Amino acid sequence: MNFEFGAKRRDPYAWLEQSLATIHRADWYRSVQPINGRPGATVVLAGQEVINFASNDYLGLAGDKRLMAAATAAIAEFGTGSTGSRLLSGHRELHRELEKAIASTKQTEDALVFSSGYLANLGAITALVGKRDLILSDQYNHSSLKNGAILSGAAVVEYPHCDVAVLKTQLSQQRQNYRRCLILTDTVFSMDGDLCPLPALFDLADEFSCMLLVDEAHATGVLGKTGAGCVEYFGCTGKQLIQIGTLSKALGSLGGYVAGSSALIDFLRNRAPSWIYTTGLSPADTAAALAAIKIVQQEPQHLAQLWRNIHYLKTLLQQLPNLKLLPSESPILCFQLPNATDALKAGKQLRDAGIFAPAIRPPTVPTSRIRISVMATHKVAHIEKLVAALKDVI
């Protein structure tokens, strides 16, 4: 291909408008709308009060006064920013308190807090594998897992969603050609709501001498008897693996973590670039997350209420035979629509009815859908209003 320069120079930014036009034609265009006030089961969105079924604040803790008080107290004592990398001036004892609390919750030897869950995935994956290694990744994994795999320089092979048989075949054919192998999976898939086949993945990791990294972002605080996550839910606590998660969903704050063996965490402190070369998590976010973990541990009623709401909604949705509901074992419930145009129309109809459950479209997902996120703070009336609105949409 020949590109002409010199006297016939073209605007090097012109392609941006052309690309945006293509996005508009495909009904893939996205924009942001302001939400006012505290987070909760109802919010004011662009001036309209709506019932919020789009939030990942599963336990309703982001608006809890105790988290806000903890954040305020941390600001008063430590200031607004951590002021540097944790290896320089950015480390506070508060960070270690949070890491110990995470390790206690996950029943691991140690944990390491990152500035976001996305950065935790990037840092861990790029530190653990490189050019002589192999990554096997579920095709529906989160963007942070996929991008971490690419950045690592390892050979990356995707396996069909939750297909253990194909994964085993891939390992049989390729594992012997690489130094190290890392299996990557979300535990709760954020755009579907289903769970990974964790026990079977453990079996394959053992059989083929692979490391196993699981992203518990949508499972932490939500699954398992104590809310420790999918690892607890499947009875796999104590098994050797790498657990990654976020502090910004059920825990109502901001940040991410890696939990595992002492050797793993010590290694990441020395080799994870997205931890080493960034400012430490702010005191306010750290304190809020620590307060949230204490609430989850001491007040199981929030988790119990979340699951009562999930079961009630599922029972009501069974009365809608035309609803193409995807399999789910989490607070995330999705129903498919034929195309992006229909999904946008359904999202608008719900919004007009006072329900915020926006359309999810390609390229985020392979097929367009409406995604519903259940919270512990939803009332029975909120759930019933959602189902009544869906009857008019479907």
From Swiss-Prot:
Its EC number is 2.3.1.47. GO terms for biological process: biotin biosynthetic process. Keywords: Biotin biosynthesis, Pyridoxal phosphate, Transferase. Gene3D superfamilies: Aspartate Aminotransferase, domain 1 (3.90.1150.10), Type I PLP-dependent aspartate aminotransferase-like (Major domain) (3.40.640.10). The modification N6-(pyridoxal phosphate)lysine is found at K249. Pathway: Cofactor biosynthesis; biotin biosynthesis. Homodimer. This is Putative 8-amino-7-oxononanoate synthase.
